[in-house]
């Protein structure tokens, strides 16, 4: 499982270094093979171990293709998916088109989301995190089922 937010640097060639604390798990789960695609809701990228992405693909494949919204989601997620592999230094190359989509510049946030990571522009991530915290702290903003989750 992937947890935590990590500030990492995008180098001049468009590569990011995976923090060492995640490398062993990625190696054991998918031999360092990853899939990156757009997030269809937020202006970020989703980075999956290959084994996890294959589960997503199976669900997408099973969607009824006569529904336009299903085809749209398939086009967005599968059409933008790119195979990646960690190199010997634990780095991976983010394709230019995907970097542009997420507005990734020098400073990037790698955010663990249990079964995947999100890649955010650092400023966008910080603004979203601040907005999320402010929204959840408003009286009555949290549904009862979520309130029970908070320790």
Curated annotation (Swiss-Prot):
Family: Belongs to the MraZ family.
Alphabetical GO biological process terms: negative regulation of DNA-templated transcription initiation
GO cellular component: cytoplasm; nucleoid
Subcellular location: Cytoplasm, Nucleoid
Protein name according to UniProt: Transcriptional regulator MraZ
Disulfide bridges in this chain: none
InterPro entries for this protein: MraZ, MraZ_C, MraZ_dom, MraZ_N, MraZ_sf, SpoVT-AbrB_dom, SpoVT-AbrB_sf
Primary localisation category: cytoplasm
Domain SpoVT-AbrB: 5-52, 81-124
Annotated CDD domains: MraZ_C, MraZ_N
Subunit note: Forms oligomers.
One Gene Ontology MF term: DNA-binding transcription factor activity
HAMAP family, per database record: MraZ
Species name: Pseudomonas savastanoi pv. phaseolicola (strain 1448A / Race 6) (Pseudomonas syringae pv. phaseolicola (strain 1448A / Race 6))
UniProt KW keywords: Cytoplasm, DNA-binding, Repeat, Transcription, Transcription regulation
């Amino acid at each position: 499982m992937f947890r935590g937010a990590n500030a990492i640097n995008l180098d001049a060639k468009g590569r990011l270094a995976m923090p060492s604390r995640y490398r062993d798990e990625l190696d054991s789960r998918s031999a360092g093979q990853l899939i990156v695609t757009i997030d269809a809701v937020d202006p970020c990228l989703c980075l999956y171990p290959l084994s996890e992405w294959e589960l997503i693909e199976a669900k997408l494949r099973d969607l009824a293709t006569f529904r336009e919204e299903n085809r749209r989601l398939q086009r967005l997620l599968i059409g933008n998916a790119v195979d990646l592999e960690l190199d010997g230094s634990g780095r991976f190359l983010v394709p230019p088109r995907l970097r542009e989509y997420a507005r990734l510049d020098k400073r990037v946030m790698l955010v663990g989301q249990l079964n995947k990571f999100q890649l955010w522009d650092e400023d966008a991530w910080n603004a979203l995190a601040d907005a999320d915290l402010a929204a959840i702290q408003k009286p009555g903003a949290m549904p009862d089922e979520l309130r029970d989750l908070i320790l």
